[in-house]
Regions:
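Beta-propeller domains
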Residues: 1-301
Length: 301
């Protein structure tokens, strides 16, 4: 496995600030015009110890999420951080325990986000199961997340859909292997499956980043969870795809910093650089600026 921070490629690393007692994690970076920003999550637990909840009721200790929006300067510093207002979202049955791992993307000249709305009540109360994690699609207006629609499926847990904007149409990678693409129908506020044909297949993995334009095609990041002794190790793959959903190339597995738990939720491209955003152990939120050309050479050759 390759480690990007030990590749010898020059990079800049921006750690987004801790806002409350919640640990920061899993940022999603976006570049819109001349602005760069990143959403990221605060969580009330520690992965470094079993049942390590440090905020909330001891009787009903469940994961709880806060979300923030950071403005990033041209000098690659954090200019400001605000809460993403979600109290109205938490009034929803499917989001009682917050929104997890928002992915920011631009569509039709506006900023949108999709994330996993969490409801742990059925597990706590041992009642008939409700959907525990539901993908919620909405628009980010300043620092307010306004839900548009939930995407209801027959799965108990939905997460990590990958937004993919092609021209003015919005798609999501629902599953990498086999490749399942969903198209959003705005008039009906629902998604439909799109037929795809690709000679090259993606590996067995899960979604991570959005898809963004790169060198005439699109680039994105997948994550893989590998069971180890009493733990799970996360690894990533970069991949290229065409606007017709043809998989063009898949990189070797890599880690950002060599940590066991890393999770990439964002990628952006500007002036020949990749901006890769990821969490470390659900306790740090990082944006990495690194040469796109040298990164591609390191991961694909």
């Amino acid at each position: 496995m390759k480690i990007l921070s030990k590749s010898g490629i020059e990079f800049q690393r921006l750690e987004l600030p801790k806002v409350t007692n919640h640990h920061p994690c899993n940022p999603s970076v976006i570049i819109s015009g001349n602005r760069m920003m990143a959403s990221y999550r605060g969580c009330n637990y520690s992965l470094r110890r079993h049942a390590g909840f440090f905020y909330g009721s001891r009787a009903t200790a469940v994961p709880d999420s806060q979300n923030y929006i950071a403005q990033i300067s041209d000098e690659f510093t954090c200019k400001s951080v605000d809460f993403i207002e979600d109290r109205h979202v938490r009034a929803r049955e499917d989001c009682l325990d917050g929104l997890e791992d928002l992915r920011l993307f631009e569509w039709r000249s506006e900023i949108y986000a999709v994330g996993a709305g969490a409801n742990w009540r059925s597990r706590i109360e041992k009642t008939s199961p409700v959907q525990q994690s539901t993908m919620i699609f909405g628009k980010l207006c300043g620092r307010i997340f306004n839900p548009i629609t939930p995407f209801l499926t027959n799965q108990h847990t939905e997460k990590n859909w990958m937004p993919w904007v092609i021209a003015d149409r919005l798609y999501f990678i629902y599953a990498p292997q086999p490749l399942i693409i969903l198209e959003y129908l705005p008039d009906e506020k629902r998604v439909k499956v799109v037929e795809t044909k690709s000679r090259k297949a993606l590996p067995h993995a899960s979604g991570s980043s959005c898809m963004v334009p790169f060198d005439g095609n699109f680039v994105g990041v997948l994550h893989v969870k590998l069971p180890m002794e009493n733990k799970v190790e996360y690894r990533h793959r970069l991949f290229l795809a065409s606007g017709k959903f043809e998989i063009l190339a898949v990189s070797e597995e890599f880690s950002f910093e060599g940590e066991i738990v890393e999770f990439c939720a964002g990628i952006a491209v500007r002036n020949g650089d990749f901006y890769l955003s990821y969490g470390v152990f659900d306790e740090k939120a990082i944006v990495l600026k690194i040469s796109a050309e040298r990164t591609m050479k390191f991961l694909f050759e």
